[in-house]
Amino acid sequence: MDGSGNGPDDRRGTVVNGPQQGEIWWAEAEDKRRPVLVVTRNEAISVLSSIVVAPVTRTVRNIPTEVALGAQHGLSSVCAASFDNLQPIRRVLLTSRVGRLGIDELEEICRAIRALADC
Protein backbone atom coordinates (compact mmCIF):
# COMPACT_ATOMS: atom_id res chain seq x y z
CA MET A 1 0.00 0.00 0.00
CA ASP A 2 1.91 2.90 -1.39
CA GLY A 3 0.54 6.29 -0.31
CA SER A 4 3.66 7.95 -1.65
CA GLY A 5 1.86 11.03 -2.89
CA ASN A 6 3.37 10.56 -6.32
CA GLY A 7 0.33 9.25 -8.20
CA PRO A 8 -1.97 11.44 -10.30
CA ASP A 9 -4.91 10.78 -7.99
CA ASP A 10 -2.93 11.28 -4.76
CA ARG A 11 -3.89 14.80 -3.79
CA ARG A 12 -3.94 14.46 -0.05
CA GLY A 13 -6.75 16.31 1.62
CA THR A 14 -8.79 16.94 -1.53
CA VAL A 15 -11.59 14.92 -3.00
CA VAL A 16 -11.00 14.07 -6.65
CA ASN A 17 -14.49 13.84 -8.23
CA GLY A 18 -15.72 12.02 -5.13
CA PRO A 19 -15.65 8.30 -4.45
CA GLN A 20 -17.51 5.72 -6.50
CA GLN A 21 -18.39 2.11 -5.81
CA GLY A 22 -15.46 -0.18 -6.54
CA GLU A 23 -12.80 2.47 -5.95
CA ILE A 24 -10.01 2.17 -3.40
CA TRP A 25 -9.35 5.33 -1.37
CA TRP A 26 -7.05 6.35 1.44
CA ALA A 27 -9.13 6.97 4.56
CA GLU A 28 -7.89 9.07 7.45
CA ALA A 29 -8.98 7.10 10.51
CA GLU A 30 -8.52 8.29 14.07
CA ASP A 31 -5.53 6.05 14.66
CA LYS A 32 -4.02 5.67 11.17
CA ARG A 33 -4.36 6.13 7.44
CA ARG A 34 -5.56 3.02 5.62
CA PRO A 35 -6.96 2.05 2.22
CA VAL A 36 -10.63 1.12 1.91
CA LEU A 37 -12.83 -0.22 -0.88
CA VAL A 38 -16.01 1.80 -1.46
CA VAL A 39 -19.09 -0.46 -1.26
CA THR A 40 -22.02 2.00 -1.20
CA ARG A 41 -23.95 2.25 -4.48
CA ASN A 42 -23.10 5.28 -6.61
CA GLU A 43 -26.60 6.78 -6.52
CA ALA A 44 -26.44 7.15 -2.73
CA ILE A 45 -22.87 8.37 -2.24
CA SER A 46 -23.46 12.05 -3.02
CA VAL A 47 -26.42 12.35 -0.64
CA LEU A 48 -24.90 10.51 2.33
CA SER A 49 -22.44 11.97 4.80
CA SER A 50 -21.17 8.46 5.62
CA ILE A 51 -20.69 5.58 3.21
CA VAL A 52 -19.97 1.87 3.66
CA VAL A 53 -16.44 0.67 2.98
CA ALA A 54 -14.51 -2.57 3.27
CA PRO A 55 -11.13 -2.09 4.94
CA VAL A 56 -8.15 -3.28 2.91
CA THR A 57 -5.68 -5.51 4.71
CA ARG A 58 -2.44 -7.29 3.87
CA THR A 59 -3.76 -10.32 5.75
CA VAL A 60 -5.19 -12.39 2.91
CA ARG A 61 -7.20 -15.41 4.05
CA ASN A 62 -8.61 -16.43 0.64
CA ILE A 63 -12.15 -16.71 1.98
CA PRO A 64 -15.42 -15.88 0.17
CA THR A 65 -15.92 -12.63 2.10
CA GLU A 66 -12.74 -11.10 0.69
CA VAL A 67 -12.10 -9.31 -2.58
CA ALA A 68 -8.52 -9.83 -3.77
CA LEU A 69 -6.57 -6.67 -4.60
CA GLY A 70 -3.05 -5.91 -5.76
CA ALA A 71 -0.80 -3.81 -7.99
CA GLN A 72 -3.40 -3.67 -10.78
CA HIS A 73 -5.60 -1.74 -8.31
CA GLY A 74 -2.93 0.79 -7.33
CA LEU A 75 -1.66 -1.04 -4.24
CA SER A 76 1.98 -1.88 -3.62
CA SER A 77 1.33 -5.41 -2.34
CA VAL A 78 -1.19 -8.23 -2.47
CA CYS A 79 -4.12 -7.33 -0.21
CA ALA A 80 -7.79 -8.10 0.35
CA ALA A 81 -10.86 -6.01 1.06
CA SER A 82 -12.50 -7.57 4.11
CA PHE A 83 -16.29 -7.71 3.84
CA ASP A 84 -16.46 -9.33 7.29
CA ASN A 85 -15.44 -5.92 8.62
CA LEU A 86 -17.67 -3.55 6.64
CA GLN A 87 -17.92 -0.17 8.30
CA PRO A 88 -19.43 3.25 7.77
CA ILE A 89 -16.99 6.10 7.30
CA ARG A 90 -17.57 9.79 6.83
CA ARG A 91 -17.04 10.68 3.20
CA VAL A 92 -14.82 13.65 4.12
CA LEU A 93 -12.28 11.21 5.61
CA LEU A 94 -11.58 9.77 2.13
CA THR A 95 -8.58 11.80 1.06
CA SER A 96 -7.20 10.37 -2.18
CA ARG A 97 -8.04 7.73 -4.74
CA VAL A 98 -5.65 4.79 -4.93
CA GLY A 99 -7.23 2.78 -7.72
CA ARG A 100 -10.35 0.93 -8.74
CA LEU A 101 -11.75 -2.46 -9.58
CA GLY A 102 -12.07 -3.17 -13.27
CA ILE A 103 -15.56 -3.14 -14.75
CA ASP A 104 -15.49 -6.95 -14.88
CA GLU A 105 -14.44 -7.11 -11.21
CA LEU A 106 -17.35 -5.09 -9.77
CA GLU A 107 -19.36 -8.30 -9.42
CA GLU A 108 -16.81 -9.31 -6.76
CA ILE A 109 -18.45 -6.78 -4.41
CA CYS A 110 -21.83 -8.49 -4.83
CA ARG A 111 -20.27 -11.93 -4.46
CA ALA A 112 -18.57 -10.96 -1.19
CA ILE A 113 -21.78 -9.42 0.19
CA ARG A 114 -23.72 -12.58 -0.65
CA ALA A 115 -21.07 -14.63 1.16
CA LEU A 116 -21.21 -12.28 4.15
CA ALA A 117 -25.00 -12.62 4.42
CA ASP A 118 -24.91 -16.33 3.51
CA CYS A 119 -27.49 -15.84 0.76
Please state what every model-predicted region is.
Residues 2-13, 17, 73-119:
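C-terminal terminal-subdomain/extension
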